[in-house]
Design a protein with these regions (language model features):
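Short hydrophobic/aromatic beta-strand or adjacent loop that forms the aromatic wall/cage
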Residues: 2-4, 58-60, 107-109, 147-149, ...
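Outer-membrane beta-barrel "beta-signal"
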Residues: 3-14, 181-193
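Detector for outer-membrane/organellar transmembrane beta-barrel domains
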Residues: 9-12, 16-137, 146
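Conserved active-site loop/cleft motifs that coordinate metal ions or position small ligands
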Residues: 77-79, 126-130, 153, 161-168
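Outer-membrane beta-barrel and related beta-rich outer-membrane complex signature
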Residues: 90-94, 141, 175-177
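C-terminal structured "cap/appendage" subdomains that terminate the fold
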Residues: 144-158
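Predominantly the C-terminal beta-signal and adjacent terminal strand-loop region
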Residues: 157-187, 192
Length: 193
């Protein structure tokens, strides 16, 4: 079982999402947003393999700033998160290719987006930039990794329908472990009812 707690403070308008589920943008519809939050997550036997398990704890600080610019000039969104990981991952688990390995160390990301004010066709463009950095402690997990992302969303119906076009460059992987340096272009679709 995973235990998670999050405490947030809304300095400006209140975010409308309940509890731990937040949005990375409100597309300007919630007015001026500036929220800072602290979270903790713990899972006994939450990392490793079926035979080499270890506990996992994470401490997080995140923020969201969103500002609809006056005179219908669009919406600026800035978001970030800093995480500290405490993972009891054994050397034997790290050597196993089936390991769901988490690392001791820290990581962060920052992003900035600008929602253009005018519709083009059925939607609005939202160009953005994002940077992700993973910093594992010690040599068991390898060196740090990072990723740059430059892209644009085409917002058709808020979070319910959008397209994404992006270019990424870096060596960060889903596990945080440094992978090969990759430069990639991708296209995504988000549709939800």
């Amino acid at each position: 079982m995973t235990y998670v707690a999050r405490i947030s403070y809304n300095f400006l308008n209140k975010e409308s999402n309940p509890g731990y589920y937040t949005s990375s943008t409100y597309f300007g519809k919630a007015g001026d947003i500036f929220t800072v939050a602290f979270a903790i997550q713990h899972q006994t036997d939450g990392t490793g393999t079926a035979t080499q398990q270890g506990d996992f704890t994470a401490y997080l600080v995140d923020y969201l700033f969103e500002k609809p610019l006056g005179n219908n000039l669009g919406v600026l969104t800035i978001e970030g998160e800093y995480k500290i990981f405490d993972a009891e991952t054994s050397a034997a688990a790290l050597a196993d290719p089936s390991c769901f390995c988490m690392f001791d160390g820290d990581a962060f990301f920052v992003s900035a987006a600008y929602l253009l004010p005018k519709k083009i066709g059925i939607g609005q463009f939202q160009p953005y930039v994002r940077y992700v950095k993973n910093n594992p402690d010690g040599s068991n997990f390898g060196r740090g990794s990072d990723l740059y992302e430059l892209g644009t969303n085409y917002i058709i119906s808020g979070h319910n329908a959008r397209l994404n076009f992006n270019y990424t460059s870096g060596d960060a992987s889903l596990t945080g472990r440094a992978g090969p340096d990759v430069n990639a272009f991708s296209i995504g679709v988000q549709f939800q009812l």
